Regions:
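Soluble catalytic regions of large protease machineries
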Residues: 1-183
Length: 183
């Protein structure tokens, strides 16, 4: 509920991607921790759905994992969005200057802090992966309906995804006779 609204989903290949999910970014000047958690959770969704449905994972979610990791890293290192690390910001890797210890590669924090940062990034990713799993298990029927609609139509809009998820929960759709996707 805190991230940008879903616009469209397609299973048609786009560039290197086997399918794409588009959102409609809202104009914002600042972003909350909850916003980034939702973005990471959404990025984990495809990989987790594959685990739930097929009981395996493949390399298809590589870009999603890369984006999720980058956001989690920035949450911890730049935006002070980690309770474990606290309100600290660490600049990106600096160039190594003559006489500087090559082992630290220009870091402005200790090996112990680097370990804590890595642990916190991993915790955020695992937490949002579990959240995605819990949501997809709860909405499994909706997931199956969305998947079937994508197989039938290749592309569906965000409103159709919402209707299919509501249908999967047994909730009445706002437009009960509307089964054609709006693309």
């Amino acid at each position: 509920p805190n991230s940008d609204p879903l616009h469209k989903v397609t299973i048609l290949p786009r560039g290197m991607a086997l399918g794409v999910t588009w959102t409609l970014p809202e104009e914002r000047h600042t972003y909350s921790r909850e916003y980034f958690q939702d973005v990471i959770c959404k990025a984990m969704g495809g990989r987790v759905a594959e685990q739930i449905v097929f009981d395996h994972v493949n390399s298809g979610a590589a870009n999603d994992l890369e984006q999720a990791t980058m956001i989690a890293r920035r949450m911890v290192r730049e935006w002070g969005m980690s309770d474990a690390i606290g309100p600290m910001a660490f600049a990106g890797q600096q160039q190594v200057f003559l006489g500087e210890d090559l082992m630290t590669s220009g870091r402005e924090y200790s090996d112990e802090m680097a370990r804590k940062i890595d642990e916190e990034i991993g915790r955020i990713l695992r937490e949002q992966e579990q959240r995605a799993r819990d949501l997809l298990v709860k909405h499994r029927r909706g997931l199956d309906l969305v998947a079937q609609s994508l197989l039938d139509n290749e592309t569906i809009d965000g409103a159709m995804v919402s209707r299919l998820i509501q249908q999967g929960l047994g909730e009445p759709s706002k437009q009960p006779n509307d089964t054609k996707p709006n693309v």
